[in-house]
Amino acid sequence: MPAIVKSLSSTEAEAEEWRLRCDMAAVFRISARHGWNEQIGNHNSLMLPQPRPDAPPIFMINPRGYRFEELTASSLIICDLDGRVVRGKGELRKVAFHIHARIHLRNPAAVCVLHVHPRYLTAISMLETPALALAHHNNLTLNDRVVVDAHGDEPVDDNQEGDRIADLMGDKTIMIMASHGVTVVGPTVHDAFDELFMAERTAMYQVTAQSTGAKLRQLPDRLRRRHNGPWGDRYDARLHLDAWRRILDKEEPDYAQ
């Protein structure tokens, strides 16, 4: 496991888990506000810190059958990497297990995995060539972290398909899934959320510009900038989620219950 999923004492793990539950619940509520979820069909997960070094790895995820706006910190379930619910009430959706558990297992840096169907990224996924153009300044940093899954039309009903998705993701953070949606990963909840938010905004600009029928202005390839610095050091990502949590604290305080 990466350093961020470190072993904690039982007391520390309990406090840390609640903090992470609140962050995850906030992301579900924010996603609902933006219409990123496909009714009850989407899922977000998070690997949890281990209370002791020999503890089996577990992850947090939304239970099957709930819309994102219904979810609260306490309603999220805890599962092991074999798909068993070990804490909480509810069922783990099989497709969620086959995608999320395999990404977590095969890519330890993917501590948080968000799988949603936001309007603009999903629209781009439906194009013959689903790609983010090098047309907006956001693309200068985003595009090197994007991979396209052009062969994901088969149902995700086993670990083999989950492994294919995980291996294709590799060290990228954004997967545009052709004719489907998007999966975004990160080392923390706030990093994955911020990455998803920026990618969807960038897709919105692209789709809006393309709707004019005019040719997109292409930025020089020499300006492409890879993300510098270790994951977890993107302070603005934490501030971004905190800002949204302040709004939720006022308008939807039950998310943190």
Place the predicted regions along the sequence by residue.
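Glycine-rich flexible loops
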Residues: 1-257
